[in-house]
Amino acid sequence: LYMYGQKVSSTIIFFFFLFDSFQLIPEKVIGLKTLDLAIIYILFLFIWGLCKYKDYIPRNKSTLIIGLFLTFIFFEMLLSHFHYGISWSEIIRTGRQHLLLLSYFVFRRLDKEEINQSLKILFVVVIIQSFLFIIQAFTGVGILNNSELFFKKGNLFRFYNISLMHYFFVFYAIFCNPFKSFYKWSTMIIAIITIFLPMHRSLSMAFILLFVLGILWVNHVFNSVKRTIILLCCLFVLITTVSTYISIRTMEDINKVAAGDYQELEDVKLSSESTFLFRVAHFYERYTTMLEDNVGKWLGLGFMTEGSPYTEAHFDFMIGLENEDGGIDQIDTPDISWSIFVIRYGIIGTILFLILYFYFIVYYFRYQSHGTICIVMILYLLLIFTTSLTSDLLYKINMLIFPLIYIDQWEDPPKNKMIQKNIDNDIFK
């Protein structure tokens, strides 16, 4: 479809594969991992583009930074096999997600109108997912994929399978909603309600702060230096007040971990509210192990898979979630991104990833005058980053696809002539 000019339809199919068939069709029905299909899609179109266009890979900062990070990933794969002795099958299973960054070269061939249309269709999909998620929360009946894990909390049921696309589209619904009147308000309300239903306190707090920031931003409050200073002072007082208890508990947790006091962690499972002590200890245990390896502390300990013979033979961490076999997950965790970073990437790789990540934020900040979608991208990236201590979303490369969509859209002269429709009808302007 992409090769025959049907780029919008092709993009929707790609996102269908990228985000677990929109959580509507179980993976066992499809027969393959949908993420693998998304990777094959991108890899095929990337190779096709290289053969068709002479200027397919532009000489710009985006290419340089993406290329630098992918070069590190390629080197890490070689290091994993020839230095650590990890099998190629494990390395490919772990490292293949990074090929999704090649989608930058695929999406830059779309014009703004095609991108806007694709996002509008995906927005409708997310609203349908959100409606089904709300039904889950009120009935306790699993509808979307991965709904097996849930708990009753008060009059509601706490499910963890909120759509990964929702983190972007909740801001899109508020600030770039393509619909009018009733449909605009109803879709916005559904999106906002859904973001609170997983009942993650850190996610809820981060969203509220970024929501307020976004409202002030689109109303140009920050254009006045005086108002900006007053606002920042108020936010500082608010954040300081809210975090007083959290800070005290955090220092107690860190002191316990440093003293080797893990007694409170013995019964921590997904069925209970994971404490910050658990997350700090999870990171601390893996960080200190990484520092003991002269190569690993800089370049990571390799691309091994969870539960493999190599992993079981080389790691014996005490802190982690209990797996199906009654053991402890050594590498993967949904509770914190940084534990995975230090194991997989080491210090150098983590720094390179952060350079890539904050490049996106700076890029969209620079072009914020070209459309509110830039503000949406920044808020989305900040949400993922601020929740990195309580989730693994920052490590998921598929979460970077949305920022990659609009990169170069304001730099290519022919594309600058396109009229950006349905992107700036902000409800708070």
What positions do the PLM features span?
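Long extracytoplasmic/lumenal interhelical loops at the membrane interface
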Residues: I143, E273, L277-Y345
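Aromatic-rich transmembrane-lumenal/periplasmic boundary elements in polytopic membrane proteins
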Residues: L235-D293, L299-T305
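Hydrophobic transmembrane helix bundles of membrane-integrated enzymes that assemble
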Residues: L1-L265, G327-M418, N422-D426
